[in-house]
């Protein structure tokens, strides 16, 4: 049974991913508060130590990251930097720390979002972070070809977050729990790398 670490396991997205993997994989649930591993995705040395405590594993799934939804006029550069760090740099930090511990042809799955491809008002920070992740994965896939696989799942607003975001994603078809589960399972099992699995488009 493959050993998969899911970071962000206690969040809205992470809980659905964990539920979809637990039957067929040994899932280790990680977040700032656990339950299996406590992890600070911004601290490379800390992340490396946590992964070392697990030993070799077969896959990393990152379900972390958020950005501020403000108009460009409202965004400070500090807001922008924080959003990029939280959504993009934290996930790349996890990926970099995981590589020495991954089994041969192991998988890394990061999470971006539809705003990397399709605009919404007040979404400039999300667009920058998601777009950067999407482009970075193709480069990393080339660098690590034959050694490991790295992909991204890019959902729309997920069904269990529609009420939270309200009209911000008006007209976008929510991504279902089933679609989320299939996508993350595919990145773990299928012989693909450098792919952005875009789950839905705006209506």
Protein language model features and the residues they cover:
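N-terminal Rossmann NAD(P)H-binding glycine-rich loop of SDR-like oxidoreductase domains
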Residues: 6-20
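Rossmann-fold cofactor-recognition segment
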Residues: 30-45
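A hydrophobic alpha-helix adjacent to the NAD(P)-binding/active-site core of NAD(P)-dependent oxidoreductases
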Residues: 36, 83-84
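Conserved NAD(P)H cofactor-binding loop of Rossmann-fold oxidoreductase domains
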Residues: 61-70
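Substrate-binding pocket helix/loop in short-chain dehydrogenase/reductase
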Residues: 71-72, 79-81
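Catalytic loop of short-chain dehydrogenase/reductase
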Residues: 83, 93, 107-145, 154-157
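C-terminal helical subdomain
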Residues: 152-154, 159-160, 167-203
């Amino acid at each position: 049974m493959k050993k998969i670490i899911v970071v962000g396991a206690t969040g809205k997205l992470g809980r659905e991913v964990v539920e979809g993997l637990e039957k067929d994989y040994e899932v280790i649930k990680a977040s700032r508060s656990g339950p299996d591993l406590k992890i600070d995705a911004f601290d490379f040395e800390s992340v490396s130590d946590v992964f070392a405590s697990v030993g070799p594993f077969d896959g990393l799934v990152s379900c972390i990251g958020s950005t501020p939804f403000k108009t460009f006029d409202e965004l400070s550069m500090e807001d922008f930097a924080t959003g990029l760090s939280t959504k993009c740099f934290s996930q790349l930090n996890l990926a970099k720390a995981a590589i020495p511990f991954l089994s041969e042809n192991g998988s890394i799955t990061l999470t971006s979002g539809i705003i990397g491809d399709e605009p919404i008002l007040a979404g400039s920070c999300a667009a920058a972070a998601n777009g950067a992740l999407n482009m970075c994965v193709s480069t990393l896939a080339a660098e690590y070809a034959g050694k490991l696989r790295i992909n991204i799942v890019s959902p729309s607003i997920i069904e269990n977050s529609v009420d939270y975001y309200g009209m911000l994603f008006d007209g976008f078809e929510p991504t279902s729990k089933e679609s989320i589960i299939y996508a993350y399972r595919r990145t773990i099992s299928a012989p693909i790398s450098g792919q952005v699995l875009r789950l839905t488009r705006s209506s």
